[in-house]
Amino acid sequence: MSQLRKALNMILNVLAGGSFILMTVLTCWQVITRYILQNPSSWSEELVSYLFAWMALLGASLVCGERGHMNIPLLVEKDSPSMRKLLCVFSELVAAVFAAVILVYGGIQITSLAMAQMTSSLGVAMGVFYVVLPLSGVLNVIYSVINIVEIMNGTINLDVTE
């Protein structure tokens, strides 16, 4: 499981980081075309918006993998280790179900609907950009399963004070 987590982390860091770098370059290009060349680039503005969504959702998957998602430590910090383990597994299950229903199922639905719609400046099917929703959902589910296995094996620190 640790190898899978490391591989996913590396891939997501490259994709999210690459999106950020490309967004920065394209935003600089927008400034140059708008203020220096006096001919604004519309396609780059649209692409930056889609890259931002990709970066945010892939970054959210990374956070899920690090168990950095929102929690309420007050509820578990005074519990016994066995109860803490149970609550952590429950939390991961809720996150996995949410990702499966909202991101995977809902993402597939919206992606298939958006395949017929084209972007205004790029001329690409909107579904191409929406595919990040089910992708992120699948990654979140995978990370949740890895987290549950590691919680049950005791390889994850359940100390909530960190």
Label the predicted regions.
Residues M1-E162:
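Alpha-helical transmembrane segments and membrane-interface helix-loop junctions
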